[in-house]
Regions:
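Short helix-boundary/capping micro-motifs
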Residues: 28-45
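A late-sequence structural motif
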Residues: 123, 279-318
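Central regulatory/effector-binding core of bacterial HTH transcription factors
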Residues: 109-172, 246
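Hydrophobic hinge/microswitch elements
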Residues: 146-151, 155-159, 165, 224-280
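Secondary-structure junction motif
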Residues: 165, 196, 202, 206, ...
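Flexible hinge/capping segments at coil-to-helix
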Residues: 176-218
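A short LG(V/I)-centered, amphipathic sequence patch enriched
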Residues: 58-77
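Beta-alpha-beta core module
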Residues: 173, 177-185, 190, 250-298
Length: 318
């Protein structure tokens, strides 16, 4: 951070009401990691330095913020209050730092991105290329996670941006109540493809309807993808005969190539590796496409590095 911050608390907590925002980061890290040692490691500090910060904070507040339970520690009610407000406070201060840095002509920063697996070999390389060309000072760190976990990572301030998806009629949509209080924006669509063995009768059509595959054996994906397949086939008037389940895209194509069954995969997943010999793909109707989303904390776009990354993601997903 190019600037140092102090958060002034106006409530009557002890004789010295001032504590720095880094202490909030320490409290949040303890909540996430479950120990002072692990929190110190995650923040790049020594364990004694973190312990001293906690002691100074407790002296200023006049209440304990952690308590020991066996060999671990947990937050007290006061500590949980601080941890709950920490993400909003740090996001606002990061935004202020970014705006001030912009005034000084700086265009650098680190953005923590989390995205689903099929985005890793498709979207992420294009994003990095875009940023290297237009904003070489922006650094991206990246972790894979499916949408529910990715949304939670933003909520817990472990990520700045989550790249997620949802399906039409998705009853487990992570952008519903679980994203309450977060900013969710739709940025594109990812067509769903029928994955068929070479020579399949439906392969001669420009688009395939799910109802055309009602009599086939099916290969399903992860539990959430399986749920979507059941809904998709249910809307087409049949229950799929699922003989195999795997979330390994290569395995799906291998099974299809051997005539074991048919499957559906998002276009992004299919484009993440060469289509296997003996396999053909045909698009399903556009109405079955999954929607791609960017999820952030409210106000995160005021942080210049985050805004630049959001704009770049929007471009590469267009």
């Amino acid at each position: 951070m190019p600037l140092a911050y102090a958060l002034i608390m106006t409530d009557n907590f002890g004789d010295d009401p001032e504590f720095d925002v880094q202490t909030l980061r320490v409290i949040k890290a303890i909540a996430d990691e479950g120990s002072i040692t692990a929190a110190a490691t995650s923040l790049g500090y020594s364990q004694p330095a973190v312990s001293q910060q906690i002691k100074r904070l407790e002296k200023r507040l006049g209440v304990a913020v952690i308590e020991r339970v066996g060999r671990s520690v947990r937050l007290t009610e006061a500590g949980r209050v601080l941890a709950r407000h920490a993400p909003a406070v740090t996001t606002a201060l990061d935004a202020a730092a970014g705006e001030l840095a912009e005034l000084r002509g700086l265009r650098a920063g680190r953005v923590r991105l989390v995205g689903f697996p099929s985005a890793s070999p498709t979207v992420v390389p294009r994003l990095l290329t875009d940023l290297a060309e237009h904003h070489p000072g922006i650094t991206i760190t990246y972790v894979e996670a499916e949408p529910p976990e990715a949304v939670e990572a933003v909520r817990e301030d472990r990520a700045d941006i989550a790249l997620t998806f949802s399906y039409p009629g998705d009853r487990d949509d992570p952008h519903g109540s679980s994203a309450s209080g977060l900013a969710v924006r739709a940025v594109g669509a990812d067509d769903l493809l029928a994955v068929l063995p070479e020579g399949h009768p439906a392969g001669g059509r420009e688009r395939v309807r799910v109802a055309d595959l009602a009599d086939e054996n099916w290969i399903a994906g992860c539990p959430r993808c399986r749920g979507h397949l059941l809904e998709l086939c249910g809307r087409a008037g049949f229950e799929p005969k699922i003989g195999f389940e795997t979330d390994n895209f290569v395995a799906v194509e291998g099974l299809v190539a051997q005539g074991i069954g048919v499957a559906t995969l998002p276009r992004m997943a299919v484009e993440s590796f060469p289509v296997m010999p003996g396999v053909i793909t045909r698009p399903l109707p556009h109405a079955e496409a999954r929607t791609l989303h960017l999820v952030t904390a409210h106000g995160a776009e005021r942080v210049p590095a985050v805004r630049i990354a959001l704009d770049a993601l929007t471009r590469v997903l267009a």
